[in-house]
Each structure stands twice: as C-alpha cells, then as structure tokens.
Amino acid sequence: IREAQQAVDTWIKTYGVRYFSELTNMACLTEEVGELARIMARRYGDQSFKDGENQDPSEEMADILWVLMALANQTGVDLTEALQKSIEKKTKRDATRHKNNPKLTADKKEKDL
C-alpha cells in the first residue's frame, strides 16, 4: 500500500500540478463510492444496467483507492500502518464474535447438509 501511496503522490505532483483540497477529495471519494454502489445495485440488486453504462466494479474500486490514497497522503496517514492496526484491532475484538454468530453459522450449517 505504501508504494501505491507514493505512486499516487508522484503522479499528482508530476501530472496533476497539485492536490485538490481535502474537502474536494472527500467529495470525490463519496462520488466514486456512489458509482460503485450503482454498479453493485444493478449487478446484485433489482435494477438492470442502462445501455452503455459502466458495468465494471474494478474500475470504480480502483478510483476509490486512488482518492483514498490521495486523502491519506494529504493528511499524513500511512495506510499500510493504519490497515495493520485495523486488522489487529478487529482480530482482538472479533476473535470469536463471528464464529459464535448464529446468523452467520446457520448458512454454513445449511450448506454443509
């Protein structure tokens, strides 16, 4: 992740002139998440795609990562370190939580039958 953050930083400074403001990038991130949500709703929900509409979630996921990395760079967040801390936090907090959740284990039991 750290290398990708550096690549985003280099691209912005080389081709983008400078970073957009944090608020603008936050709005851009929200927009990209909305675009992914539209694809997911059409693919897995009840709506169908319109003619010519983007159906590729990977493109939108990559756009989300791009803007998230730009925001991280602007705010001094090392996403490699932050993700590791998040994994550790979730592991400590949820070590048995999901294994003991009947809502999750019921499906597994039904599939095993």
Listing of model-derived features with the role each one plays in the protein:
Residues 1-61, 65-113:
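Flexible "arm" and connector segments at domain edges
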